Amino acid sequence: MKLLYFIVLTGLCMACHQPRVYRINGSLPGALDGYVVKLYNIDTYPDVLLDSTVIKDEKFQLEGTRTFEYPKYCRLVVDMTPDEPDQRKKTLKAYRFFADNTAMEFQCQMDSMPSYYWEPVNKEHNVTLTGSPTQDLYQAYKTSVQELSERKTALWNEYLKVYHVPALDGIFNTEKGMKIVRELNRVKARLNEATGEFIKVHNNSVVSLLLANNLLNSTRSEMTVEEIDGLMNGFTPALQNASMMGDVKKTAERM
């Protein structure tokens, strides 16, 4: 009896000391056996391969070997042509998200998954990823600015159609073009303001580091030194050692 008690107690102690790592259980209806799934950390350049596996019965599993100090911004890539040696001829699907030290579920129809490459229609909404609180926060941000983002895209496409494309043939619809640009700038300002407010409220999250880097890159020289300093000094000390913080600082220094 004492031996049994010791074995059970030892097992419980070992379980308690197991590192908390990410685990992704994936379901890709329509995927063929042999498709390769890879998970990359894209916090910084170059990307770092975290894990890889092969799809079997439309399912896959990825699991970490050590605990993330901070949630990682990742890209999950599905290689539908693993035997193709020419990278230019490969068919790749990809999805970017934040991974926590948690059990996550990834679901998407294979033919509806976003492409690794640019495509005119954003398909990220076809993916369901649950179990990552950090990704939930990022999704909450995207939902909060969805209307502004869609309006910004629509205005840019209208500008290309009304002014840019005709200008290539020597037709300059200047008045119409300037009207669109003024409205586009107003929408961009509102979007930047909403992003800035989100960063202030969530200044302890790596999500805000990603958004800050995007904000700095999109505004370029439009931000004043005081605004940049205010942005950089607004993060909690807990984020100072995050790899994404290094990228944000480099971007700010180039402004």
Question: What spans do the regions from the language model cover?
Answer:
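Sec-dependent N-terminal signal peptides
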Residues: 3-12
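Amphipathic alpha-helical repeat scaffolds of TPR domains
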Residues: 157, 174, 204-218
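A non-transmembrane, solvent-exposed segment enriched in polar/low-complexity residues
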Residues: 16-183
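Helix-turn-helix repeat elements of alpha-solenoid scaffolds
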Residues: 183-192, 222-229
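N-proximal helix/coil linker or "cap" segments that precede and/or mark the start of modular domains
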Residues: 227-255
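Alpha-helical solenoid scaffolds that mediate protein-protein interactions
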Residues: 198, 215, 235-239
